[in-house]
Amino acid sequence: MNEQIKDKLKKIPHKPGCYLWKDKNGIVIYVGKAVDLANRIKQYFLKDRDLKTKKLANEICDVDYVVVNNENESLLLENNLIAKYKPKYNMLLRESNAFPYILVTKEEHPRILYSHDSTKKIKGTYYGPFANSNIKKYELYNFINRIFPLRKCNKLPNKKCIYYDIGQCLGPCIKKVTRQDYEPYLKEINDFFSGKSKSIDEQLEKKEIQAAEKLMFEDSQKYLELRKNLKMFSERQDIIFSQKNDEDIIGFYCKENVISIVIFKYVNGSLLSKYDLITVFYSELDEILLTLIYEYYSKIAIELPKTVYLSLSDEKLKTLSESLKIKFLNPSKGVKKDVMDTAFNNAVEIMKNKYLQLISNQNRELNSLEELQKLLDIKDLYRMEIFDNSNIFNTNKVGAMVVYENGVKNKNEYRKFNIKDEDANSDYDYMKEVIYRRYKNNTASFGEIPNLIIVDGGKPQVKAALESLKFLELDSIIPVIGLAKDDKHKTDRIVKWDFSEIKLDKKSDLYFFLLNIQDEVHRFAISFYRNKKSKSLFENSLYKIKNLGKTRIEKLLEKYETLDKIKEASVEELSQIVPIEVAKEIKKL
């Protein structure tokens, strides 16, 4: 502890508030909150502190703090400070749209939609999120959309559509259809998502048998798979409360400085989904629980429950209730206590399965970042942006950018680039264009300026990046390095911005850390290239179909953003854009 901190510790009040630990460069490395600032801050410098806290404390060179009126205010302030400074030791939740939802819109003529958007921009009833990777969610959605005659068209057409002819729509485009007409189907959909799926299973079984009798074995297998999906989905509704309330039940388990949390989400009394998390923390257990739970309900949860059951002190539960406007309770007995015990057991299992790997990975990542920081003599390495290009014979030229924050990839910040310069014919040209376009207008869509740019390649790629940065007057602000390969095409050295080289120890954690980064950007670039190439080949095939001209192809590609979505679309869906005979030809491709 230096003299500056010793002096500040004498002046810190015994009041609630937030504290900010800073390193030797003045960078905020941790934000915490406390009911008593003075007592909490002094705990970091006790002799019997654990290894994780010791690691954090060894980096501390200064502290700032903000006094507030109560714990509720400190919780809100902590959240804002973490968002502002993004400290490397705050292992908080990041919003994710990875898991899909199925949405029934609240329009006059409702539709069933498949969405990854958790912001609820479209008004309606959201079912999900569906995290089970074994469930073929989109196929299940397609089947549900076909058997319930809700509106399929984005806008009502002026004449009847094929969905009305084949019995998949009530036909509001040609006759009066009221909301009451949809009610039986809406109830049946809700029953399905409540686990009452017997009638749908019977329909699938009937189609499976009919397909087998016609020797259409692929179709028969498809219906069998859908039935299995339906069974897996229904099994998630095993725990049902007699009271049809929207409630969450939280269990957690702590081992040293690692916490695992499980949240059971109940909708209308039925268990709909499970959310789990395991993370390292550097504060008191009550503090990190408050922070993580606040983060979850303020940023990640799409539907807020009326009540949350959690084993915490009355004081902490009151703080959460006031902050989130949700009732937080601690059940002492009964079925809610039993389910909380189940959630606790789940949290214990997560800890058993992931603890060692989490600690090992985190230590390697932090150590590798520190080693790279020292090696390059860079002030901070919070954010790194890594670039690669992909093409074959100068066709379907693409660039890709991946982002790492505190040594962890942030997929929400990944970006793809189509090479626009038709005269560009080398990796040097592609890199130059991509770097220029990334930093020309540092808009919010790209995130903040990185602490380091890494390019996949040696001196030519580093030179290309530096040229674009120099043109933008950023060459003295953002350092650039390249990951270069030897004669055997194996990465073996770092090429710095001054073109000096640093040989890498192929047995070191840093080497494997950089190799993983390089593999990630290469994978991302290659997948983008393959998709673009496949799309190009698919487009060429489309042009060979009779009565399918440029305008119709453009409309197809406008509605179905990816090739997979075109392939998944039924003949009936495609026939909304092209004649039905043309739609059948497309399905043959």
From Swiss-Prot:
GO terms for biological process: nucleotide-excision repair; SOS response. Residues 14-91 form the GIY-YIG domain. One of its GO terms (molecular function) is excinuclease ABC activity. GO terms for cellular component: cytoplasm; excinuclease repair complex. InterPro entries: GIY-YIG_endonuc (IPR000305), GIY-YIG_endonuc_sf (IPR035901), GIY-YIG_UvrC_Cho (IPR047296), RuvA_2-like (IPR010994), UvrABC_protein_C (IPR050066), UvrC (IPR004791), UvrC_RNase_H_dom (IPR001162), UvrC_RNase_H_dom_sf (IPR038476). It is found in: Cytoplasm. The UvrABC repair system catalyzes the recognition and processing of DNA lesions. UvrC both incises the 5' and 3' sides of the lesion. The N-terminal half is responsible for the 3' incision and the C-terminal half is responsible for the 5' incision. This is UvrABC system protein C. The gene is uvrC.
